[in-house]
């Protein structure tokens, strides 16, 4: 008689984990008497293997309370010196625990793999767009997970929106993760279709020559996007500012149109 798939569901118990009671030895006299009695009454004898099989089938449908009783019996047998039955099969929680990296090398390797899966690994000269709250910060990738970017002179202002209103900036060589401040990022060489990038060695030379220099900063004419585009293409350009100016012009035009409409004399109706 086969078991349905539901038997191995919530109320199923793996038989390998349940310590079955040891069969007691029956004397030959009692065995003979029982066989004679069964023969006299006309009942057939049931082999022990069939009884154990029936018991195994019933165990599949035992409620949770009986499961707990089985576990208590297993604990008592362990305390009495009996060797508990162990299963070599790993549970999902054990599998997850074993996959967690423990050593520093494993952690660093995992982080690098996750970074590669989330974003392609940058190459020297690639532009990095960092999505901060309210604006996008830009940097240029150099080597060994390090970038060069414009930053305010005060470290307290780094990563803050107030940094975009400063009139000075310092060119810094920093680790990418230190520049992110928990923000997301991506490689964005979007002007490659408009301008031909300079040779990589020239980009790197120009970039390294700017490190630690203090430069004039202007949100409209010389921000971080102007800076990295100038290093890669030789053209200081910021599409972020261009889009803002276009949207501002549209908004100003809409306001002006509304004002003109409001002051325009209306025709008198009879």
UniProtKB/Swiss-Prot annotation:
The keyword DNA-binding does not apply. Residues 1-54, 70-122 are annotated as: Disordered. The active site is at residues 137, 149, 224. InterPro entries: H-rev107_PLA/AT (IPR051496), LRAT_dom (IPR007053). Residues 24-54, 100-116 have a biased composition (Polar residues). The keyword Transmembrane helix does not apply. It catalyses: a 1,2-diacyl-sn-glycero-3-phosphocholine + H2O = a 1-acyl-sn-glycero-3-phosphocholine + a fatty acid + H(+); a 1,2-diacyl-sn-glycero-3-phosphocholine + H2O = a 2-acyl-sn-glycero-3-phosphocholine + a fatty acid + H(+); 1-hexadecanoyl-2-(5Z,8Z,11Z,14Z-eicosatetraenoyl)-sn-glycero-3-phosphocholine + 1,2-di-(9Z-octadecenoyl)-sn-glycero-3-phosphoethanolamine = N-(5Z,8Z,11Z,14Z-eicosatetraenoyl)-1,2-di-(9Z-octadecenoyl)-sn-glycero-3-phosphoethanolamine + 1-hexadecanoyl-sn-glycero-3-phosphocholine + H(+); 1,2-di-(9Z-octadecenoyl)-sn-glycero-3-phosphoethanolamine + 1,2-dihexadecanoyl-sn-glycero-3-phosphocholine = N-hexadecanoyl-1,2-di-(9Z-octadecenoyl)-sn-glycero-3-phosphoethanolamine + 1-hexadecanoyl-sn-glycero-3-phosphocholine + H(+). Its EC number is 2.3.1.-, 3.1.1.32, 3.1.1.4. Isoform 4 shows highest expression level in testis. Residues 127-240 form the LRAT domain. It is found in: Cytoplasm, Cytosol. One of its GO terms (molecular function) is phospholipase A1 activity. One of its GO terms (biological process) is N-acylphosphatidylethanolamine metabolic process. Keywords: Acyltransferase, Cytoplasm, Hydrolase, Lipid metabolism, Transferase. One of its GO terms (cellular component) is cytosol. Belongs to the H-rev107 family. Exhibits both phospholipase A1/2 and acyltransferase activities. Shows phospholipase A1 (PLA1) and A2 (PLA2) activity, catalyzing the calcium-independent release of fatty acids from the sn-1 or sn-2 position of glycerophospholipids. Shows N-acyltransferase activity, catalyzing the calcium-independent transfer of a fatty acyl group at the sn-1 position of phosphatidylcholine (PC) and other glycerophospholipids to the primary amine of phosphatidylethanolamine (PE), forming N-acylphosphatidylethanolamine (NAPE), which serves as precursor for N-acylethanolamines (NAEs). This is Phospholipase A and acyltransferase 5. It comes from Mus musculus (Mouse). The gene is Plaat5.
């Amino acid at each position: 008689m086969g078991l349905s798939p539901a038997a191995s569901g919530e109320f199923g118990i793996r038989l390998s984990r349940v310590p079955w009671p040891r069969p007691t030895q029956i004397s030959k006299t009692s065995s003979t008497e029982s066989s004679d009695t069964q023969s006299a009454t006309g009942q057939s004898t049931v082999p022990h293997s069939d009884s154990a099989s029936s018991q195994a089938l019933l165990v599949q449908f035992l409620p949770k309370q009986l499961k707990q009783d089985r576990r208590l019996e297993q604990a008592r047998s362990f305390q009495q010196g009996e060797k508990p039955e162990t299963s070599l099969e790993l549970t999902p929680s054990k599998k997850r625990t074993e996959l967690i990296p423990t050593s520093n090398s494993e952690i660093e390797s995992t982080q690098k793999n996750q970074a590669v899966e989330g974003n392609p690994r940058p190459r020297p000269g690639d532009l990095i767009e960092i999505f901060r709250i309210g604006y996008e910060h830009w940097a240029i990738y150099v080597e060994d997970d390090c970038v060069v970017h414009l930053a305010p002179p005060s470290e307290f202002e780094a990563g803050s929106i107030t940094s975009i209103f400063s009139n000075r900036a310092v060119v810094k060589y920093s680790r990418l993760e230190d520049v992110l401040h928990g923000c997301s990022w991506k490689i964005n060489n979007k002007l490659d279709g408009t301008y031909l990038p300079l040779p990589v060695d020239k980009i790197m030379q120009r970039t390294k020559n700017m490190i630690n220099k203090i430069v004039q900063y202007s949100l409209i004419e010389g921000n971080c996007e102007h800076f990295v585009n100038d290093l890669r293409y030789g053209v200081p350009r910021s599409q972020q500012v261009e889009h803002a100016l276009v949207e501002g012009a549209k908004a100003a035009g809409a306001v002006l149109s509304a004002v003109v409409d409001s002051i325009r004399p209306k025709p008198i109706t009879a």
